[in-house]
Amino acid sequence: MGTDHVASVDWAARAARQPLPSGLVIDGESRGASSTRPVVTPRDGGTIGQVPWASAQDADVAVAAARRAFDTGPWPRLHPRERGEVLQRFAEVVEAHRDELALLVSLEMGKPVRVAHEVELRALIRTLRFYGEVADKENGEITPTGEGELSLVTREPAGVVAAVVPWNFPLTLAGWKFAPALAAGCTVVLKTAEQSPLSMLRVAELALEAGLPRGVLNVVTGDGAEVGRRLGEHPDVDVLTFTGSTAVGRHFLRYSADSNLKRVYLELGGKSPNIVFPDAPDLEAAAATAAWAIFFNSGEMCTAGSRLILHRDIAEEVLERVVAAATAWVPGDPLDPSTRMGPLVDERSMSRVISQLEAGVDAGAEVLVGGRRIDDGREGPYLAPTVVSGLAPDNVLVREELFAPILSVVTVDDEDEAVRVAGDTPYGLAAAVWTSDLGRALRVSRRLRAGTVWVNCYEEGDLSVPFGGVKLSGFGRDKSRHALAEYSDLKTTWISYG
């Protein structure tokens, strides 16, 4: 591809002729469902097609296919190297269809097509390649024993995995689930989010082109209350992994308790603090990054830096720069390659966010910029980038995960107060610290209860490091070789031969 391939494509024209997936992918086949549902694009609120809408019965069929593929099929019995080779081919096929998949992501959930192409698809391709590489790198153990005895500790695939994924990164987060599960030798039933069914259905079709055996990766749509619940309660599901809200995560724990006690891994909400101290190495960079951390992906990120905690000595300077930076994040047409920020995912999200904003203002919050729906004649749920201050500790804009481009700013007097304010949340997904003092960086990082802490940066990382949270942000880890442990069982084999 050229130096700016994304800019060279007429994405709107391509969207007009883009075919949509026509079936659920179950047992290696594209299948219809008993009903369909319109796909509404947040780009302009228009209907772009129909998608088959799965029921609990369809989920049963998908689980049965995954169960057969695990119990009697070749996938768990392949040499791990061979599974890795299939995942590498899978990555190549996805790469060949990168434009198509980026367009589907942009259409279904409003992500700017450049971000879909350069971030979302890059992440999925790298995830497939990473787990293709490490599939045969996990070793067992031989532990010390007495004469005439041998003990073996091996990792075996856990079985059928149900993955329930969100709409905000419909391929990135799905890949973080199904790629390590497949590498470990499991079979998968993945339920798409209601708002973003298209891209993952197409990826499942491409998996078959890459040589994944039938029944190994099954993808269904459907309502969470019906299909998600059925997967959570299904006795033939061995592991359930979920990314989404804390409220829904609680349901999955109940479903497990009421069924077969399947293992459950949860990556849930966040209200991540971004702390800037006076000795930050570059206040301009800190301010620009603070804006990026909340306005990227329209703030629809579980790790969004939604709470900016500023030391009083530099609060005015940094806040002025953040407000200026916010004005540069202009929501636009997601199919325009120059757009940095698109709409919210749907009108329901817009209504919820506006209600939360109004409640926050009624409780004393001051809107410094934004705080309104963009009303310039365009269709679609476009929200202006928003910065608010003057927040009491119990203000809804400080306490709740908004999943929107809304930055809440709090001023503190010292390090202890910064840590206390940062920790005054039920969540513990991520945090950031800006300081030139290595001692302070390490000290504050240790004191913050979060799955990831960034120092002098935000949202940096790699597939080689794990991702997940603590407290109400969940448990279990995506990414890295550590994720393979979530989809495998440890077995001890003790042999007496003397």
Regions picked out by a protein language model, each given a short descriptive name:
Residues 1-51, 85-89, 139-162, 265-268, ...:
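Terminal low-complexity tails and localization/encapsulation signals of metabolic enzymes
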Residues 45, 83, 105, 128, ...:
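Residue-level signal for inorganic ion chemistry
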Residues 45-138:
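Glycine-rich loop-to-alpha-helix module at the N-terminal edge of alpha/beta enzyme cores
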Residues 46-49, 237, 275, 330, ...:
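Conserved C-terminal structural/oligomerization subdomain of aldehyde/semialdehyde dehydrogenase
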Residues 47-54, 71-76, 163, 274-278, ...:
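Short, well-ordered beta-strand elements within core beta-sheets of diverse protein domains
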Residues 139-285, 412:
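Rossmann-like NAD(P) dinucleotide-binding subdomain of oxidoreductase/dehydrogenase enzymes
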Residues 187-189, 367, 452:
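A short hydrophobic/small-residue beta-strand
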Residues 247-392, 455:
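ALDH superfamily catalytic-core signature
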